[in-house]
Design a protein with these regions (language model features):
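PRPP-associated nucleotide enzymes
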Residues: 1-124
């Protein structure tokens, strides 16, 4: 049985601040898009912190966020249009990353997940 690891709102807020401090100077994002449902809360938080629009659909140069990248399926399309090209279209960010068979790796993540634990987000 997997051990549950509970993230707090403070940890999520710290992550948002890390992203803000890391990327605000590096890349002028056109907006932030959150994958439904897990990425929406992070997208709203980042939209406020970065003072950029919350997008209803992703656009070139935007930040794409999700709560977790585990199977890689939800981020696969964006990953193929991000890291695999010389001109980067998207920056992918998740709270949690787990190695997956699709080899999808976000540009930035906070927690590497292992097979022996399960992350529970504060909004769950």
């Amino acid at each position: 049985m997997k051990t549950k690891v509970y993230l707090t709102w403070k940890q999520v807020e710290n992550f948002v601040n890390i992203i803000k401090n890391k990327y605000i100077l590096e890349e002028p994002f056109t907006g932030v898009y959150g994958l439904p449902r897990g990425g929406l809360i992070l997208a709203v938080m980042l939209s406020h912190k970065l003072h950029i629009p919350l997008l209803a659909a992703p656009s070139d140069g935007c930040l794409i966020v999700d709560d977790i990248c585990d199977s890689g399926e939800s981020l696969l399309h964006y990953f193929q249009n991000s890291s695999g090209r010389s001109k980067k279209r998207y920056t992918l960010v998740t709270l949690v990353y787990k190695e997956n068979l699709l080899n999808v790796v976000p540009d930035y993540y906070l927690i590497p997940e292992t097979d022996d634990h399960w992350v529970v987000f504060p909004w769950e």
